[in-house]
Amino acid sequence: MDGIITLDYGSGGRKTSALIEEIIVPAFKNEALSAFSSDSFVVTPLEFPGGDIGKLAVCGTVNDLAMCGAKPEYLSFSLIIEEGLPTDTLRRVVTSAAAAAKAAGVQIVTGDTKVVERGRGDGLYINTAGIGRIKYPGLTPAAMRAGDA
């Protein structure tokens, strides 16, 4: 790792992995962290061909857990809603998220809702956290081999 944090450490790539593996995980020394993922979703537009922010949030967190060798089981689903968002849009996004959770076999068990002033939220932000049971320990980028796909 470099001696200073740069934007590269937030990209989700090798530097993010190094940051997590070299600083964060050793500090907590808790195996359960290997099957816990948290993410925030801030996309525009909220609805797009093939999906929406709700489906993206659920599928993104489920994928993050699966990529760590875990079977996703439970999610939190928190909303930051901008004042003025049409309720029909919110209903479609939440219904889509529920359908994605059902399709993935996960339960949404908790969440939070906040409303921010008009002009301060880009419509809707979603934060999720997921917990899964580790089925394939040691599934890491370092363990990948040619032909694993």
Language model regions located:
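Generic N-terminal amphipathic, Lys/Arg-enriched alpha-helix
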Residues: M1-D8
